[in-house]
Amino acid sequence: MTATASHTRARPLGASEIEHATRIAEPDFDLLDALYRTDDPDDQARLLARVVLSAFDNYYAVSRRIPALAQAAFEARDWPVTVRLSKIRIGLYTACIDQLVPLLKAGLPELTTDEQLWPTAEAELLAAIEGRYEADFAFAFWQSLRRKLVSDEWRPVSYDAGSTARRTTSPAAVLKTTTTTLPITAEVIAGILGDAGFRVPWRDRDGDAALAAQAIETALEPLSPRPGEPVKIEIADAGFFRNRGACLVGRIQLRDRGDMPMRNLPLLIALLNEKDGLVVDAVLTDSDELQYAFSSTLANYHATNPRYHELARLLYELMPKRPLGTQYSCIGFHHLGKVAVMSEILAEHRKTKERLATAPGFKGTVAIAFTMPSSAYVLKIIRDHPTDDYKFDYFDGLDEVLRKYNLVHEIDRAGSMLDNIIYSNVKLDRAMFAPELLDELLEAGIGTVTLDRGALVFRHLIVQIKLTPLPLYLANASAAESRAAVINLGDCIKNNAAADIFNKDLDGRNYGVSRIRKVYLFDYDAVEPLTSVTVSRDGAAPGEFDNGMVFRPQEMLEGLRIDDPGLRRAFRDAHPELMQADYWEGMQRALRDGKVPKVMNYPASRRLQR
């Protein structure tokens, strides 16, 4: 971000400006022509590497422009543009691959079968990206394009191997440090806010700084601070932008003082841009709360600092309960996160020797879910046909269900839907699977799973963060934990609605509870756009749905299957509007008008009290 601030309202971004800034440049046709014309294998390898690297450079240049555009949209309070930028960014990688693949197939069809050309060309590419920061990302792009052309199996290529190797990443390169003594004063916080360099005015920076300093002082109390004790505040040299909000992220460090070891306190300063200026909306100092704010259930952040390895490492240090791979994904680097997640799953198996077995909870009617006991992830496939317990008259088929999982990946998940990593043509060792699971996969997933000697090959494989299914959680939780979970279930349903997502199968078994006790929707075979659903008022004929598209809010509690009367009452008392047609119709009108409903990304208790 810039280091200066203006006192004028930012100019909205024009449609043509966004179009120009996010347009992918055409492939280098001169290089393509030279590639098509040469018969020399060495020249073909060299030119293929140059063509692909040129396409990657085009992609990477656009992807790095988008965070600055997101900052400009935040400063201009142009919320529809923030949503549009997220959609553009998430589809950019695939669009660039898809732009080049047909040209290579048409001009050099032997690429799909020539087994000698690819290794030689790969060596040329690795030599060309030697020393570049984004070398691993360029190599990921290369592998994605190769799989599209060759229809090869997906494998977690080690992008940190060979000539793309890098030293162990430290977040120090992306941190700005302020050294002071306790107590942390309003003036120190005001300096940090001012150094963020927004180009729009603050409503009351000094007042917000005083409130933030007070919140930080309260959060430090369990660490036994002493007046005058040295303290270091490290803030990422990056703005994080998403939808209506922005945040500054870092940590507070108290040194080892003999009787106390070094102490670290995560820090997130959440910002809003209101009509009368920037405000500090909340201060988060708990790792679990940061994890919720940076959850993969939300839209990705646009981070203005290009050093994605250091940013991901910083986020991992602040939120160690979340695997490193998901830290890449939450700042928009899905393809690096995809590799990291599969590498973590394989490493978990090597370390624990555990086998993949059916996931705890109820048997899925559409999906087969499986996991290892100590793994952080759940893997899924879609059945060829639903089980006999399937609720609806018509099953759209495997490809349509996968389309819905992809849809959820590509939208703002509003803090209440798990992201999906979807792999194609993945091969996993047969020994990783428990015999009962192996039999079920091969019997119920004939169109998806095949046995290839000592391995299972998956046409598709969905990976999600592991949750505890809501009914299983309620069966083992305390009364207070259960009450909090059903209230959070209502928040989840509201947030889904704000993202134009309606789950027509409102069974509580489709929702789960995370390690930080947040409730999320995780099964997507029954999701529909809320704007396409007909909301029925009281007096309609009985039955939850008509042809799967008519929703009767007054029947919501029956659909959720919350059997405990006290929990049903807690849900109804906390969210009475969810049982009323007016609420749902109002949300539909807002979505159709292009409005961006507000979504709460952190506990209301962390908002500054003015």
Swiss-Prot record:
Gene Ontology molecular-function annotations: [isocitrate dehydrogenase (NADP+)] kinase activity; AMP binding; ATP binding; phosphoprotein phosphatase activity; protein serine/threonine kinase activity
Binding site for ATP: A359, P360, G361, F362, K363, G364, T365, K380
Single GO cellular component term: cytoplasm
Places the protein is found: Cytoplasm
GO biological process per UniProt: glucose metabolic process; glyoxylate cycle; tricarboxylic acid cycle
Enzyme Commission number(s) of this protein: 2.7.11.5, 3.1.3.-
Catalytic function, reaction form: L-seryl-[isocitrate dehydrogenase] + ATP = O-phospho-L-seryl-[isocitrate dehydrogenase] + ADP + H(+)
Pfam families according to UniProt: AceK_kinase, AceK_regulatory
Annotated InterPro entries: AceK_kinase (IPR046855), AceK_regulatory (IPR046854), Isocitrate_DH_AceK (IPR010452)
Positions of the catalytic residues: D419
Swiss-Prot/TrEMBL keywords: ATP-binding, Cytoplasm, Glyoxylate bypass, Hydrolase, Kinase, Nucleotide-binding, Protein phosphatase, Serine/threonine-protein kinase, Transferase, Tricarboxylic acid cycle
Major localization class: cytoplasm
Functional note: Bifunctional enzyme which can phosphorylate or dephosphorylate isocitrate dehydrogenase (IDH) on a specific serine residue. This is a regulatory mechanism which enables bacteria to bypass the Krebs cycle via the glyoxylate shunt in response to the source of carbon. When bacteria are grown on glucose, IDH is fully active and unphosphorylated, but when grown on acetate or ethanol, the activity of IDH declines drastically concomitant with its phosphorylation.
Record-linked HAMAP family: AceK
Assigned protein family: Belongs to the AceK family.
Name by which UniProt lists this protein: Isocitrate dehydrogenase kinase/phosphatase
Species assigned in the record: Rhodopseudomonas palustris (strain TIE-1)
